């Protein structure tokens, strides 16, 4: 049974398929059809809803894609849909009124998703800047209205005062309700399908040993596609959503520690503080809805050759802490990837933490090439950490995604640079060595030639930026409206 708040109503559900998404639950079980399905893969945002949860005694709101969220993730949270925004006197919520006033809807299919993203933004950042608005809406697509009136509507809500609505008035009562259901059972069973929701790392380790064929799910932003896109049945799920000790985000004297269950959006501040380019890339990692659910641990465990974070972690010489039963081990992340979608992870073993060395200088850079600026998969992702002493390369770690069957270091390129003067001529030699490091495939995202040339040009860009630290040109397009 799972227990959660549907707006202000406590719901206890024990007859749901563990494979059911929140979108299907809303539309087929409780007749809340305002939430739409556009793509079923987390790309369009039409299905956006907002989840509220108690964090350190405060109510925190997150926009999420309901098409990628399994119902087990609702336990202990508040689920808010576009229908719930209407005031008790049936008047429009301030967000809804703004969209009407600024003519931000035409066919209306995408409008509920936009409104929920704007609602979450208003709750989290009432004084939102245009950059905040663009980030919040980057995961919502509109094919007929055009974005300017929608952005104008969102900007009209920006104020230095908290958003006052019925949710603000009921906040203390909502927190009490959520706190009252935290310790209730959180497992789901329907026929031969089961979803377990352990609440500690120790409990997770025991469960995974008892069910070694189970699928672990954190945010579910990738695993849910097996259900929504490929119509597969997942017999046993183990959700780590409630494992709070895997949501650590801290720094020691030497390292940054990121829990494998920490949402990407929660890791942003720490990573941006120490590695600005890492933070910049996370802004381009899918959409805010996906970042509010997905985790770096999941991005690593997925072992995709085009995952955005593994090349960066490899270039930074990061390590991962793995747990199996009562035993733990730590390994360099570059050793984790064996071949396409094959890792060094043993049966019943899972990633517990990602450990990133703190920087000793500002030599790290990361670049991503994709067809869209926001919410798109990489054609090539490159990460560089090259250190120069007395005009010569003393240290070099270069890694790419999208260039091989796994995220991989460019060792020939590195060796060409090590000990050599940091010059244009040597950079050109190293660029040529990248063609020996990798033989990328051609697919619908990019050809082999395009990938190879892009990777080489990333190295050249890195060289130019390092040579011209005080005269950098901004190449990022920050707004379309």
Label each residue range with its predicted role.
Residues 10-30, 74-94, 112-130:
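Short, charged low-complexity linear segments at domain edges
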Residues 18-49:
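A basic, amphipathic helix-loop patch mediating RNA/tRNA/ribosome contacts
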């Amino acid at each position: 049974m799972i227990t959660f708040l549907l707006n202000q109503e406590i719901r206890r559900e024990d007859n749901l398929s563990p494979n059911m998404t929140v979108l299907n639950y809303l539309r087929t079980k409780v007749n809340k059809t305002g939430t739409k399905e556009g793509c079923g893969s987390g790309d369009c945002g039409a299905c956006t809803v907002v989840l509220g949860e108690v964090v350190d005694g405060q109510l925190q709101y997150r926009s999420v894609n309901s098409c990628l969220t399994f119902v087990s993730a609702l336990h202990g949270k508040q689920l808010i849909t576009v229908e719930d925004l209407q005031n008790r006197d049936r008047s429009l919520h301030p967000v809804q009124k703004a969209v009407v006033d600024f003519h931000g809807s035409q066919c209306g299919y995408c409008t509920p998703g936009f409104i929920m993203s704007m609602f979450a933004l208003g709750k989290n950042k009432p004084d939102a800047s245009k950059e905040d608005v663009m980030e919040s809406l980057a995961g919502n697509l509109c094919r007929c209205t055009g974005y300017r009136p929608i952005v104008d509507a969102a900007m009209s809500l920006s104020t230095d005062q908290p958003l006052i609505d019925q949710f603000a008035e009921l906040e203390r009562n909502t927190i009490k309700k959520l706190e009252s259901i935290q310790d209730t059972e959180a497992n789901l069973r329907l026929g031969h399908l089961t979803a377990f929701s352990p609440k500690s790392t120790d409990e997770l380790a025991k469960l995974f040993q008892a069910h070694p064929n189970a699928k672990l799910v954190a945010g579910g932003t990738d695993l849910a596609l097996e259900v929504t896109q490929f119509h597969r049945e997942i017999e046993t799920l183990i959700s780590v959503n409630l494992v709070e000790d895997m949501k650590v985000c801290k720094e020691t004297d030497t390292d940054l520690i990121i829990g494998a269950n920490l949402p990407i959006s929660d890791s942003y501040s720490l990573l941006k503080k120490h590695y600005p380019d890492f933070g910049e890339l996370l802004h381009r990692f899918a959409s805010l809805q996906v970042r509010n659910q997905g985790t770096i641990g999941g991005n690593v465990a997925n072992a995709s050759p085009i995952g955005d974070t593994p090349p960066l972690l490899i270039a930074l010489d990061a390590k991962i802490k793995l747990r199996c039963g009562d035993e733990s081990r730590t390994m360099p992340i570059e050793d984790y990837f064996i071949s396409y979608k094959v890792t060094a992870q043993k049966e019943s073993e899972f990633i517990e933490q990602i450990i990133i060395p703190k920087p000793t200088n500002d030599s790290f850079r990361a670049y991503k090439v994709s067809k869209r600026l926001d919410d798109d998969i990489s054609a090539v992702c490159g990460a560089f950490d090259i250190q120069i002493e007395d005009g010569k390369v003393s240290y070099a770690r270069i890694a790419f995604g999208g260039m091989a069957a796994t995220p991989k270091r460019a060792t020939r390129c590195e060796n060409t640079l090590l000990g050599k003067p940091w010059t244009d001529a040597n950079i050109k030699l190293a660029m040529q060595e990248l063609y020996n490091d990798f033989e990328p495939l051609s697919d619908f995202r990019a050809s082999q030639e395009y990938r190879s040339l892009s990777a080489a040009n990333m190295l050249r860009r890195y060289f130019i930026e390092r040579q011209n630290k005080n005269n950098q040109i901004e190449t990022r397009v920050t707004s379309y409206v």
